[in-house]
Every structure is written in structure tokens, then in C-alpha cells.
Curated annotation (Swiss-Prot):
GO terms for molecular function: translation elongation factor activity. Belongs to the EF-Ts family. It comes from the Bacteria. Residues 81-84 are annotated as: Involved in Mg(2+) ion dislocation from EF-Tu. It comes from Pelobacter propionicus (strain DSM 2379 / NBRC 103807 / OttBd1). This is Elongation factor Ts. The gene is tsf.
Length: 312
């Protein structure tokens, strides 16, 4: 198949590999993006590509946590331009939708759009969205949301980075969540959320890593090691060390703490548990990167002018 310049550029941005290497990788893998990333990693030409590097859209990620810290919502709403994303009307719309989800607990996005809007039950959320699009003058999409509810002992906290470019919501479980310890635990939860915004974990523990994800990594490490000519028994030992490093990269409970690199997240939790007088554990988290997985339509102004003038 013919490989386009756009495909090569996308792969280059995601992996940092050279243009010619990206072109060859795409040609070898029939244009498949993920397989091309694996090919480059096998050849030692790229690190693991983060999907966030492919993000390209405008809007805002926002978080909403109930006063009792028992419920939380992480929300992404997209706009066409950064100008509108900074508009007070758009920000108010994001806040209203977040508060609606927090108060009504819809099952999913479609159910939420069909609900009576909590700010004006005479209209649905979809109607409110349509009205807001007309007023703001730009297409707006309520893309996704995640809602956490604490059933037992525990609380929820969140962190929003760079004015809504990255958002993280964290839930911890602990019998030590009391009014006396609330400041200690809420500070911890926010710090863990801030860490997660920077470190980009994908799972809490290594046990949560899907088998197919783990096998894919092993295959890449194995293929790369075989190119060195090492015997299989040595290769398998090398893979064990590389997989442990992989866990340290993607599992929150195995990461080095970004605010103090002399500590790990488990050590931070242990210290906070001692201060609060009860064990604190991270049960789950959600991390949204604005526009993650979406592609922004890019225009070539020179080409548009040439086309308008009837030039090739």
C-alpha cells in the first residue's frame, strides 16, 4: 500500500524515530500504526509510543468532587478551537455538565444526553448542548466522563493540569478517613493525582496488566535481544529485568514518586498511613488527556490558496 506523508509524520511524532525509519516501518507493516511502533521498538529505534502523543483537539478536561468526597466525576468536553475553550461561556457549560453528572449519576454518555437537564428540567441535556452550540457559535462535543462512588471507607480526589489539558481522579480506601485526618488524606490523594498526571500510569498494580499487553512487551524484548546473538537462556533472564522495568513505568504502585524521586508511591502511602493512623490504599484512578486518540484536522494554507486560484 502507498504510505502517506501524514502517516510518516504521525509515527515520527509518536516515536521520535527518523523519517526514513518511520517510512520503512510503515511499509513493512502495511501502514498499521501499532505494528509499526512495535517494529521500531524491536529495532531499538523508538521508545514505547504514548497514545497521548497522538492527541490533537481543543476543549477542556475538568473534575468535580462532592463535598463529602464520596463521589467524583472526570469529564472531557471538546471544542473546535482553543479560543472557544478559554471562553467563559464554554467554561460555564463544562461546569454545568459536570455538576449535572455529579448530581444525577447517568449510566453513560447517551443516557446522560437523554436526561432532563438538572439546571432546567424542561429541556434535555441534548437540548441544552444544542442551545450552547448556537450561543457559543462553535461545535461542542461532550466526549466522555468517568464517575467514581465510594461505597465504604475512603475518599476521592482530583487534579487538573495546565488549565484542563490533563485530568486525573483518584479513589483511595482507608478506615482512617475521618474528619480529624481529612486534610492528611485529601492532600495525599491530590498528590497522587498530580503524580499520575505527570507519570502517566496505566494500571494500579501489575496484576491488572492484561496478559496480551504483557506478551506483546515480552515479544518486543525477545526479538530485540535475539539480534544481539545472545543464547535463549540469557535472553529470558534479560526479559525478566525488562518486564520489571516495564511494570515500574506503567503501574502506579511501582512508580518512583515524581515530587520526591527518593521515594516510591508505596513509600508515600506508607508514610501517609502512619500519619493518619490507618492503612491507605489506592483502589483506582482515571486519567484523561485532552483529545487523546482524536486527530485534529490540519489545513495546508498554501495548498488551499493554490487550489482556490486554480493552481496545482
Amino acid at each position: 500500500m502507498a504510505i502517506t506523508a501524514a502517516q510518516i509524520n504521525e509515527l515520527r511524532k509518536a516515536t521520535g524515530a527518523g523519517m526514513l525509519d518511520c517510512k520503512k516501518a510503515l511499509e513493512q507493516n502495511d501502514g498499521d500504526f501499532e505494528k509499526s511502533v512495535d517494529y521500531l521498538r524491536t529495532k531499538g529505534l523508538a521508545a514505547a509510543a504514548k497514545k497521548s502523543s497522538r492527541a490533537a483537539t481543543e476543549g477542556m478536561v475538568a473534575a468535580f468532587v462532592s463535598d463529602d468526597l464520596k463521589s467524583g466525576v472526570l469529564l472531557e468536553i471538546n471544542s473546535e478551537t482553543d479560543f472557544v475553550a478559554k471562553n467563559d461561556l464554554f467554561k460555564a457549560f463544562v461546569n454545568n455538565i459536570g455538576q449535572h453528572i455529579l448530581s444525577t449519576s447517568p449510566a453513560d454518555r447517551d443516557a446522560m444526553l437523554a436526561q432532563p437537564y438538572s439546571g432546567d428540567p424542561s429541556k434535555t441535556v441534548q437540548s441544552y448542548l444544542n442551545e450552547s452550540i448556537s450561543v457559543i457559535g462553535e461545535n461542542i462535543q461532550i466526549r466522555r466522563f468517568s464517575r467514581f462512588d465510594v461505597q465504604g471507607d475512603g475518599c476521592i480526589g482530583a487534579y487538573i493540569h495546565a488549565g484542563g489539558k490533563i485530568g486525573v481522579m483518584v479513589q483511595v480506601e482507608s478506615p482512617a478517613v475521618t474528619s480529624a485526618n481529612q486534610e492528611t488524606i485529601t492532600t495525599l490523594v491530590k498528590d497522587v493525582a498530580m503524580h499520575s498526571a505527570a507519570a502517566a500510569p496505566r494500571y494500579v498494580t501489575r496484576e491488572q496488566v492484561p496478559a496480551d499487553v504483557l506478551e506483546r512487551e515480552k515479544d518486543i524484548y525477545r526479538a530485540k535481544a535475539r539480534e544481539t546473538g545472545k543464547p535463549d537462556n540469557i535472553i529470558e533472564k534479560i526479559i525478566v529485568g525488562q518486564i520489571n522495568k516495564f511494570y515500574g513505568d506503567i503501574c502506579l504502585n511501582e512508580q518512583v514518586y515524581v515530587k520526591d524521586t527518593d521515594k516510591t508511591i508505596p513509600q508515600v502511602l506508607k508514610e501517609a498511613s502512619a500519619a493518619a493512623g490507618g492503612t491507605i490504599g489506592i483502589s483506582r484512578f482515571e486519567r484523561f488527556v485532552l483529545g487523546e486518540g482524536l486527530e485534529k484536522k490540519e489545513s495546508d494554507f498554501a495548498a488551499e490558496v493554490a487550489a482556490a486560484a486554480g493552481l496545482k
